[in-house]
Amino acid sequence: MAWSEYKKNETRENIGPGAMVKNGMGQYGFFCDSDAGIKILGVQPSEFLPVPSDEIVATFVDIEQMIAAGWVID
């Protein structure tokens, strides 16, 4: 799925640790930045709110690479 420029810019402006992100295939994850770059952590179901799992579902060098791979803020 190709995201709109609006959605891509919203991601660039508002992304931060713990933000929920999604890709064009309907997969969700949590944004996590580290010294090694960006990690997208999986989502663990819970009774009230989704929480990050220990599973790393994707890694990126920077936000532009993340967006190019189809991940945007939800």
Model-derived features: where do they sit?
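Terminus-proximal functional modules
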Residues: 1-74
